[in-house]
Amino acid sequence: MMKFTVVAAALLLLGAVRAEEEDKKEDVGTVVGIDLGTTYSCVGVFKNGRVEIIANDQGNRITPSYVAFTPEGERLIGDAAKNQLTSNPENTVFDAKRLIGRTWNDPSVQQDIKFLPFKVVEKKTKPYIQVDIGGGQTKTFAPEEISAMVLTKMKETAEAYLGKKVTHAVVTVPAYFNDAQRQATKDAGTIAGLNVMRIINEPTAAAIAYGLDKREGEKNILVFDLGGGTFDVSLLTIDNGVFEVVATNGDTHLGGEDFDQRVMEHFIKLYKKKTGKDVRKDNRAVQKLRREVEKAKRALSSQHQARIEIESFFEGEDFSETLTRAKFEELNMDLFRSTMKPVQKVLEDSDLKKSDIDEIVLVGGSTRIPKIQQLVKEFFNGKEPSRGINPDEAVAYGAAVQAGVLSGDQDTGDLVLLDVCPLTLGIETVGGVMTKLIPRNTVVPTKKSQIFSTASDNQPTVTIKVYEGERPLTKDNHLLGTFDLTGIPPAPRGVPQIEVTFEIDVNGILRVTAEDKGTGNKNKITITNDQNRLTPEEIERMVNDAEKFAEEDKKLKERIDTRNELESYAYSLKNQIGDKEKLGGKLSSEDKETMEKAVEEKIEWLESHQDADIEDFKAKKKELEEIVQPIISKLYGSGGPPPTGEEDTSEKDEL
């Protein structure tokens, strides 16, 4: 029976792929694949029959998922933002993925807030990020907006490489993300001006990257994906280009950052013991420690000890300690071991033995930790994980292949993706019981209906409460949404027939309908976590904000450029006047004095007017040119070379 369902699902999906081909008549341009990570993001594109992972403007193929606001009002994204974390910790935002789609009361949010250097506040029962955006202005951002800024950076990285606009993308999420987190990620794409054609699960994307060129026979593949902030395990079968997820499990709140945190806590305690001082009071010191601990952790993947040296760490004192691999492992051993539980669960759910697994694929930067590799190897009785895949880039690689399929690229072959819903979905029935409609690990897209009835006589309304989770009582599961079906004609309890239908689309997003079979009366809800999700108005406002920010960034850059032009013009003149070999030796003392005075005046003005407008900078430069040009012309005869070796903007203006 199960085999039949899968085949049916495959046909269903092939149908969906065909339907997609119909949709494809609209030109989507080049679709990019984006791995939106907790700590780093990565973008790829399918071009000329192969995937290109695109380097950013710093030449790096992965970009930190960081956004910062400087005191001057400049917004930095990526490497530039991460590089100034220690000098501006309160206004450097990271880890938005740990907050996205969660409520304020979520225990993991409350735990995270303790360690984040920026301010997280409650707004509409959700965590919002509050920062100073320069000029004494404070602004709150939804986690979706911060993620949107990172997505914008990835979009621009792709555009710079492709030389054209990018409007459509495939974005990946942890397989264990729930409905709210998926929907919020889609919203982030919208705010960034991207049409997110498909949300795909990270381990599935990694499996595509691994298995794309492996066409022989059916294989069982276990993907173990441990990144900066999330952990997923998925078991897939790959058979001639058909990728079917059989089971998935994980923890959306476990990753490299948690390992860093353990080491930081260890050193903070140690420092207090040695000096009696509590470093936690100093945000900058904590962020310096964070940066150095992360470096040491990376070093320990290839060596047995690393030194952590921080100059003027706290109250002017230096910090110098050694971290050994053994100590690092001891501090994190419980977390490392906890990664084996989901592996066990996935095997149980798919009715497979350890020996049935053909390949183990390690994904995510944290799988470079030797202890993690050892635990995985021991769990599978000494089987070596497969090595042929870059753990940082695999997810973006797979997303780019899926993007190639969606943009109708012929070279992707007949790739078919069968994914599953990670959590059981159901409704609450009398006594707070969770009645399951779609069990977890059901292949999506899927549709399931069941008939329910009323609990009391003449009941005019039924309230449908939709939950996700594995526990038998709804109070222990996660409420997705609630809606009412009204206008049920009076009848004894148990007589009315109410058909409840659950339908999940390819993005794993759920729609629930309820219909009174007697009257044909219908109501439906697309589970978009109304209480937890941005409204269309909010999304529109955020899209406008994002455009405004981009505009402001552009203006700010122009202002800085014109300021720099004036500054380099003035200093270049100053140097030449002071150089006896150049201008200085050719000017009359009167002209020299006039020029020196004019140049000094502009340099002084610049020092006290850093925040002037573009127009002011231009005007001051023009004033200076009006004094300098006649003197130079007199000296060289008109049409002579300009005074500075590099600047000839005045000539350009004349054209």
From Swiss-Prot:
Alphabetized Gene3D superfamilies for the sequence: 1.20.1270.10, 3.30.420.40, Actin, Chain A, domain 4 (3.90.640.10), Substrate Binding Domain Of DNAk, Chain A, domain 1 (2.60.34.10)
Tissue: Expressed in sperm (at protein level).
Post-translational modification Phosphoserine, affected residues: S87, S650
N6-acetyllysine PTM positions: K126, K214, K272, K327, K354
Cross-link Glycyl lysine isopeptide (Lys-Gly) (interchain with G-Cter in SUMO2) residue location(s): K353
Species of the source: Mus musculus (Mouse)
Lineage, opening ranks: Eukaryota, Metazoa, Chordata, Craniata, Vertebrata
Positions of ATP binding: 37-40, 97, 228-230, 294-301, 365-368
Residue ranges, compositional bias (Acidic residues): 645-655
Alphabetically ordered keywords of this record: Acetylation, ATP-binding, Chaperone, Cytoplasm, Endoplasmic reticulum, Hydrolase, Isopeptide bond, Methylation, Nitration, Nucleotide-binding, Phosphoprotein, Signal, Ubl conjugation
EC number of this enzyme: 3.6.4.10
PTM statement from Swiss-Prot or TrEMBL: In unstressed cells, AMPylation at Thr-519 by FICD inactivates the chaperome activity: AMPylated form is locked in a relatively inert state and only weakly stimulated by J domain-containing proteins. In response to endoplasmic reticulum stress, de-AMPylation by the same protein, FICD, restores the chaperone activity.
Protein name: Endoplasmic reticulum chaperone BiP
Activity-regulation annotation: The chaperone activity is regulated by ATP-induced allosteric coupling of the nucleotide-binding (NBD) and substrate-binding (SBD) domains. In the ADP-bound and nucleotide-free (apo) states, the two domains have little interaction. In contrast, in the ATP-bound state the two domains are tightly coupled, which results in drastically accelerated kinetics in both binding and release of polypeptide substrates. J domain-containing co-chaperones (DNAJB9/ERdj4 or DNAJC10/ERdj5) stimulate the ATPase activity and are required for efficient substrate recognition by HSPA5/BiP.
